[in-house]
């Protein structure tokens, strides 16, 4: 199965989504399709053995829409006809390439399906065919298509306004007819085209209602123009105002939709176009597409990091807010990883390129956000059911309104009955209902991405809102995931520094995690070099021994010391480290006990505060771990967790989550290790912390790349704000239609007022969703919690 995000053109209203969804899902080989009107894209999963991109594009066209084609020029180093032909053949085999043309000057033009084909793949295919090329600028991308659509709509709006303006003046009826005809079949063609596409697929959208209303007004006015009666009015001007106002609403809707989709655009703009790459002995500026794996790239102050890689030399402070949501610069030194798209605040470094193109972290984030914005949340099902019957219902209501007015309220008054019927058609707004959920999800997931929280789907966002039970894995989630020296307990007369440095002198010869913890602590306490150790030996599970400064030193467990015949009575006066669930390392010199060191996997500094916030919000907090009960309870007590599941094997974790769900709880599992995978898979809401394994990340629907637990309350905050906004959108859309349609049927509204109200309802939904962009800017954690 293959997943693609395909850009779609000619979706003019939210009702188009259901039509295209059904058309794509009926195509053999397509497992699922999720269309997003606001993002103008479709997320499609299909079987490559059954169908292909050409068949999918053909089905999209048959449904009345278009799949645009991007153009990528590739400039060959040598303009040789035979080599160019071989390169063209190689390009045609690249996934996502629709066709290739060889220009007269030897330039290769690749025509691409809009699925994000990487220019590096195209260049690599050409190189494989013996033709080195330089990728040119991509034409017809997302930004180009969005600008083109907006400009076309603006031209149509201006033309409509220019045609309507003369109709507002006193004119001869036949001149009004000519101007009205130009208006109806000029700018009005915008609605006719969309309505016709819907009719061909037996679906009705807002544009069909507008076309029907406008056509009825036009035909009535045309009839009156050529009928020798003086008592009837012409409504060409009303028709023009109706079309112009709706076009204005459409244009404003496009502007607002562009703002709603700004998160992905901002992420894409983080990728610099060029970079300083080493070629020979010098660094030259090259397009990012020409960077290869292991190339050395120079990063200067104020520049964005062009690729994922490892620092080879130099030091810098990098702003990784695009990944973590936190703008505090992170110091980087040789050996540290840097992420493409992050901003170098200060310093200069040389980076060895590693992950390029679609393999980079930035590209993966963009794909996750795209997927989340296209996936439908469960709350969308209600809107889909209503929208399916909305337009036929409005047409029926309009027909009934006409009959009641023509036969009962104003008998034989065709003018009044027809205008009231058109009022009903004009005021109804299925788009507000169709936009309510996807715009909320788009803005909410985009805002979350800006804050370093990645939702993979709308369902995950909704489940996070519903979660009332949070289960933490211990190691690497509540704790730092690595042992650290926490206690220095010297015997009487022994200096703490002496105890630590003596143990570290011996442990520096070992690569055991406990040894690294001791050595790291000693180096933090003093810059002085550690004395060398001789005759070093390691006893598995017991400890280490050797000679330091001519004295025999032993560092290990009490049991081992007793086996070696060393008197451990002095340890009785020291704190009980075992009782605190810590590993005890006893240190002796020349057979005399000097003291003990306590080592433990320390809790994260923010863990206790986060748990307190979750509990204050009414969420039940659990900790699940494979550790012994004593260790688990010690950590739980430190962070404030009352419910502990200890000594749980990896294969038992999923069953533990299922038991909690069976009690009626909506469970959010937070983990990061490979043994969390089964539990993450069965939880209602699965959160993977940064640094987790690929398997864990695949099993989780929500990612916190920074690994910062403080993002968890913010996650719930954003999910709640998003679902609340969606519900308010749906309530407004339903309320508007339930009130406006009956009012219009009373005949008290002018068609222009109806058109204004209809446009305003859609724009209102979009603007209300855009308020989510401010979510999380203030330090508001769980604002729904009532103050006592």
What label would you give each PLM region?
Residues 22, 31, 35, 145-274, ...:
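Transmembrane helix-loop-helix hairpins at the membrane interface
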Residues 85, 548-550, 583, 589-728, ...:
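Conserved ATP-binding TGD loop and adjacent catalytic N/P-domain core of P-type ATPases
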Residues 31-37, 41-46, 95-112, 265-359, ...:
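Conserved cytosolic catalytic loops of P-type ATPases
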Residues 323, 382, 419, 429-506, ...:
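Conserved catalytic phosphorylation-site environment of P-type ATPases
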Residues 485-619, 629, 641-657:
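P-type ATPase nucleotide-binding
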Residues 1-171, 282, 363, 367-375, ...:
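Flexible metal-binding regulatory segments at protein termini and peripheral loops
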Residues 200, 219, 223, 227, ...:
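Membrane-embedded alpha-helical bundles of multi-pass transporters
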Residues 73, 77, 85-89, 236-301, ...:
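Juxtamembrane coupling segments of multi-pass membrane pumps/enzymes
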């Amino acid at each position: 199965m293959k997943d693609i995000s395909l850009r779609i053109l000619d979706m003019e209203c939210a009702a188009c989504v259901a039509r295209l969804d059904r058309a794509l899902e009926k195509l053999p080989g397509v497992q699922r399709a999720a269309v997003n009107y606001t993002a103008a894209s479709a997320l499609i999963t299909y079987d490559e053995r059954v169908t292909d991109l050409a068949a999918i594009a053909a089905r999209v066209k048959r449904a009345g829409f278009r799949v645009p084609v991007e153009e990528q020029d590739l400039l060959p180093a040598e303009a040789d006809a035979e080599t160019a032909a071989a390169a063209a053949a190689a390009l045609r085999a690249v996934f996502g390439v629709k066709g290739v043309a060889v220009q007269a000057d030897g330039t290769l033009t690749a025509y691409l399906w809009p699925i994000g084909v990487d220019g590096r793949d195209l260049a690599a295919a050409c190189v494989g065919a013996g033709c080195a090329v330089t990728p040119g600028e991509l034409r017809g991308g997302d930004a180009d298509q969005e600008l083109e659509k907006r400009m076309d709509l603006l031209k149509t709006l201006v033309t409509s306004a220019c045609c309507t303006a003369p109709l507002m003046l006193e004119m001869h009826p036949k001149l009004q007819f000519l101007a009205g005809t130009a208006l109806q079949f000029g700018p009005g063609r915008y609605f006719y085209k969309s309505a016709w596409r819907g009719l061909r697929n037996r679906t009705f959208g807002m544009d069909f209602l507008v076309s029907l209303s406008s056509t009825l007004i036009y035909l009535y006015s045309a009839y009156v123009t050529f009928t020798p009666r003086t008592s009837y009015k012409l409504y060409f001007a009303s028709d023009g105002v109706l079309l112009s106002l709706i076009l204005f609403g459409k244009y404003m809707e496009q502007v607002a939709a562009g703002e709603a989709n700004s998160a992905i655009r901002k992420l894409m703009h983080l990728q610099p176009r060029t970079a300083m790459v080493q070629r020979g002995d010098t660094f030259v500026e090259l397009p990012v597409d020409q960077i290869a794996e292991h190339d050395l790239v120079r990063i200067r102050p104020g520049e964005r990091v062009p690729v994922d890689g490892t620092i080879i030399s130099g030091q810098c402070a990098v702003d990784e807010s695009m990944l973590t949501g936190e703008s505090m610069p992170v110091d980087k030194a040789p050996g540290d990883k840097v992420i493409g798209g992050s901003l170098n605040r200060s310093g200069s470094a040389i980076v060895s390129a590693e992950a390029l193109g679609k393999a980079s972290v930035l590209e993966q984030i963009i794909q996750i956000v795209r997927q989340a914005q296209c996936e439908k949340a469960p709350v969308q099902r209600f809107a889909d059911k209503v929208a399916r019957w909305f337009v036929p219902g409005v047409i029926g209501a309009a027909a009934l309104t006409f009959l009641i007015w023509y036969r009962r309220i104003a008998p034989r008054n065709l003018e009044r009955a027809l205008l009231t019927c058109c009022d009903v058609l004009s005021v109804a707004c299925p788009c507000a209902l169709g936009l309510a959920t996807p715009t909320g999800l788009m803005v909410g997931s985009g805002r979350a991405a800006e804050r370093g929280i990645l939702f993979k789907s709308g369902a995950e966002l909704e489940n996070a809102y519903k979660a009332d039970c949070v289960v933490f894995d211990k190691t690497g989630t509540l704790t730092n995931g690595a042992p650290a020296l926490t206690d220095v307990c010297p015997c009487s007369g022994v200096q703490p520094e002496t105890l630590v440095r003596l143990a570290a002198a011996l442990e520096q010869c070992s690569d055991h995690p406990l040894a690294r913890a001791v050595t790291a602590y000693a180096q933090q306490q003093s810059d002085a070099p550690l004395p060398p150790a001789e005759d070093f030996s390691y006893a598995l599970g017991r400890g280490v021994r050797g000679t330091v400064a001519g004295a025999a030193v032993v560092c290990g467990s009490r049991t081992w010391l007793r086996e070696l015949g060393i008197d451990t009575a002095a340890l009785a006066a020291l704190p009980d480290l075992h009782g605190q669930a810590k590993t005890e390392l006893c240190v002796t010199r020349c057979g005399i006990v000097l003291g003990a060191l306590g080592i433990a996997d320390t809790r994260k500094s923010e863990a206790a505060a986060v748990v307190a916030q979750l509990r204050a919000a009414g969420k039940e907090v659990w900790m699940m771990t494979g550790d012994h009960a004593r260790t688990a309870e010690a950590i739980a007590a430190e962070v404030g967790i009352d419910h502990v599941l200890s000594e749980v094997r990896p294969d038992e974790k999923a069953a533990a989550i299922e038991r909690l769900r069976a009690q009626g709880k909506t469970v959010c599992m937070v983990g990061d290790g490979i043994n969390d995978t089964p539990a993450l898979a069965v939880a209602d809401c699965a959160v993977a912390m940064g640094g987790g394994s690929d398997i864990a990340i695949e099993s989780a629907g929500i990612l916190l790349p920074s690994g910062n637990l403080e993002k968890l309350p913010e996650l719930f905050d954003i999910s709640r704000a998003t679902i609340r906004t969606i519900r308010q959108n749906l309530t407004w859309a339903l309320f508007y239609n339930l009130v406006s349609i009956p009012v219009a049927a009373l005949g008290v509204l002018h068609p222009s007022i109806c058109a204004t109200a209809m446009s305003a309802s859609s724009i209102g939904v979009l603007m209300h969703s855009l308020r989510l962009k401010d979510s999380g800017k203030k330090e508001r954690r769980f604002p729904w919690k009532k103050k006592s």
